[in-house]
Structure formats: structure tokens, C-alpha cells
Amino acid sequence: MRERLKARIRCLGQAIWLFRFMESEIGYQKSELAVVFERAADRMEGGFPKILHRVAKRLQLRNGEDFKKIWQEEWTGAEKENGMLGEELSVIREFATQGYQDVHMQLMQIQMIRERLEQIKNRLEAELQQKGRIYLCVGMLSGMVVSIILI
């Protein structure tokens, strides 16, 4: 349970980094989304690079697919690839509307998504800390019970 929570927090950290990176690439470099995803994937570990490479490849093919469709399809099943749950993935999937927005609106949406991911991460970190205390107390109590039984 605790390890799963730690894995979710790690994945959220990666997602937050991704959206910070996207913010700087789109805001300062004025890069296209396919280029942003390729650059981000080259700098990341875990399940994210696979997803981002697939999105970038499909965007570069320019076969008439809608960005929203590509983004939604590639993030479907991401729970298996990187341990994220529906709550985080639904926030990430909201980025799918980006294909139709200008740079300013993209940056605003990216910032909003990043902030929501940070809120989820902060909540999970507090939960992890609280559960850590509970596990410590339960461990100490079970140790005392065993020692009393043996005495």
C-alpha cells in the first residue's frame, strides 16, 4: 500500500516536471507540440517517454488525426505503464484541448493542469506521512505484544 502510494507520488512528480517543461518550451522556445513531446521524452524515465514518443510520432505523421483523439488514446491504459490512477490521468487527459488554442491559452491551461497535479501530489504526500506514522505505531505495538507474550 505504502509503496504504491510512493510510486503514484513519483509519477505525479514526473507529470509535474513534464508540464513545467512544456510551459518553458512552448512559452520561450515557441516549439510545436510534437517537438516538445520528443524533447521531454528524451529527458524522462519510466512509462512517460513511451507515451510521449507515440504522441509525437502520430503528430508528425500528419495523417489528419485530431490531437484530442491522439492524446486521449495514448494516455488510455497509462495506469499499467506508470502506476497512475484515474484522478491524475483525468487531469492529464484535459490537455487534449490544446490543439485548438493559441500560445497564451496553451500556457494558461498547462499552468492550471500543473497546479492541479501539484495539489494531488501534496495531498498524497500528506497521506503518506500520516500512514507512515500509523504503520510505525502498529509495528511498535505488535512488537510489544509479542514481547509480552514471550515473557
Residue ranges of each PLM-predicted region?
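Short, non-transmembrane cytosolic segments of multipass membrane proteins
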Residues: 73-104
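Membrane-protein extramembrane domains
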Residues: 58-82
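Residue-level recognition of alpha-helical structural elements
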Residues: 8-11, 33, 48, 64-67, ...
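Juxtamembrane/interface alpha-helical elements of multi-pass membrane proteins
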Residues: 1-60
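A structural signal for well-ordered alpha-helices, especially hydrophobic packing surfaces
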Residues: 23, 48, 56, 60-63, ...
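Canonical alpha-helical transmembrane segments of integral membrane proteins
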Residues: 140-146
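Juxtamembrane boundary at the C-terminal end of a transmembrane helix
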Residues: 147-151
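Membrane-interface, cytosolic juxtamembrane amphipathic helix immediately N-terminal to a transmembrane helix
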Residues: 7, 97-140
